[in-house]
């Protein structure tokens, strides 16, 4: 277990040029970076924009905002603004900024290298630190707080469904047993050791704690709900011809993105009415891109990334019961 001694990090933006190349089709347009991180995508987007272009960025992590405003990666550009929000809340940010429709929206899901490599954030089993895992430490329940109070069945469900861990039952039992001894799990090293004892087989090249840590992070940050809500709201805010670019890092997120694009970009016929005209398509699938060998060699964390790109058509959104369908 690595301690909290200063571990230098170098954040490498995954699929940087591929995402921005696909996203920016109108240099004078208005764009949203829904997951600013350390600003890699935002910087390149700004390079591609005309003087009349505009980029709005949001991030839920206060450290990302502080870095964007005054840190080493500060962006000083009149076309740029950054706001503290979850990406599912982006519509309120646009409303406050007086923006109606977007020419492009980028989501880079998952966590950044600075978050992973900071022991105090509690995201990684490689470092000993408080078991927090919140992307926004100012609100919500930490992973330790969840494990200290959740019943066995709920812990098992989270580890099984969000971590796709086949030893979820054993992991949950070990966590609850320790809690009943009066020693609730409070640190990353404690959880990693507990999971290592509960997971009976090893996956090649993967720490036994990987799936459990992923599951808790997804739960604590409501990551899957964020993706679903953000995508549905993006559909209403993208201008005709506007692009949606989403980078996912695990199968649960990517499945949501893939299903969303397919649902709105695939012709659907009602089998009960074989001669009926299919509903007009709201989106057009543009690309599915994975990192090349060179990028994966330089940045192993890019290995699981998938970029999916879709374009909004000019078909108006149907309105159902006072809201968008």
From Swiss-Prot:
The keyword Cell cycle does not apply. Keywords: Cytoplasm, Methyltransferase, rRNA processing, S-adenosyl-L-methionine, Transferase. It catalyses: cytidine(1402) in 16S rRNA + S-adenosyl-L-methionine = N(4)-methylcytidine(1402) in 16S rRNA + S-adenosyl-L-homocysteine + H(+). It is found in: Cytoplasm. The keyword S-adenosyl-L-methionine applies. Pfam families: Methyltransf_5 (PF01795). PANTHER family: 12S RRNA N4-METHYLCYTIDINE METHYLTRANSFERASE (PTHR11265:SF0), S-ADENOSYL-METHYLTRANSFERASE MRAW (PTHR11265). Specifically methylates the N4 position of cytidine in position 1402 (C1402) of 16S rRNA. Belongs to the methyltransferase superfamily. RsmH family. This is Ribosomal RNA small subunit methyltransferase H. It comes from Leptothrix cholodnii (strain ATCC 51168 / LMG 8142 / SP-6) (Leptothrix discophora (strain SP-6)). The lineage of its organism: Bacteria, Pseudomonadati, Pseudomonadota, Betaproteobacteria, Burkholderiales.
């Amino acid at each position: 277990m690595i301690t909290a001694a200063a571990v230098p990090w170098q954040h490498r933006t995954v699929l940087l040029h591929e995402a921005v190349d696909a996203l920016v089709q109108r240099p004078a347009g208005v764009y949203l970076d829904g997951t600013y991180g350390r600003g890699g995508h935002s910087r390149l987007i700004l390079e591609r924009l005309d003087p009349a272009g505009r980029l709005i960025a949001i991030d839920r992590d206060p450290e990302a905002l502080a870095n964007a405003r005054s840190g080493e990666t500060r962006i000083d550009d009149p076309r740029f603004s950054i706001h503290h929000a979850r990406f599912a809340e982006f519509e309120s940010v646009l409303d406050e900024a007086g923006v109606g429709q977007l020419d492009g929206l980028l989501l880079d899901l998952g966590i950044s290298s600075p978050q992973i490599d900071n022991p105090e954030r509690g995201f990684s089993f490689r470092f000993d630190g408080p078991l927090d895992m919140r992307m926004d430490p100012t609100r919500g329940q930490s992973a330790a707080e969840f494990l200290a109070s959740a019943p066995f069945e709920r812990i098992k469900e989270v580890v099984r469904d969000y971590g796709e861990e086949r030893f979820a039952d054993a992991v949950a039992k070990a966590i609850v047993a320790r809690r009943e001894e009066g020693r609730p799990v409070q640190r990353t090293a404690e959880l990693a050791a507990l999971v290592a004892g509960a997971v009976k087989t090893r996956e090649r090249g993967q720490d036994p704690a990987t799936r459990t840590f992923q599951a808790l992070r997804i739960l604590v940050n409501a990551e899957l709900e964020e993706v679903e809500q953000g995508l549905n709201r993006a559909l209403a805010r993208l201008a005709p011809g506007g692009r949606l670019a989403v980078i996912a890092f695990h199968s649960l997120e990517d499945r949501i993105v893939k299903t969303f694009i397919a649902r709105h970009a695939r012709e659907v016929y009602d089998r009960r009415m074989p001669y009926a005209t299919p509903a007009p398509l709201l989106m057009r699938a543009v690309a599915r891109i994975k990192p090349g060998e060179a990028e994966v060699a330089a940045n192993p964390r890019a290995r699981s990334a998938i970029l999916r790109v879709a374009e909004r058509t000019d078909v108006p959104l149907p309105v159902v019961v006072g809201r968008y369908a």
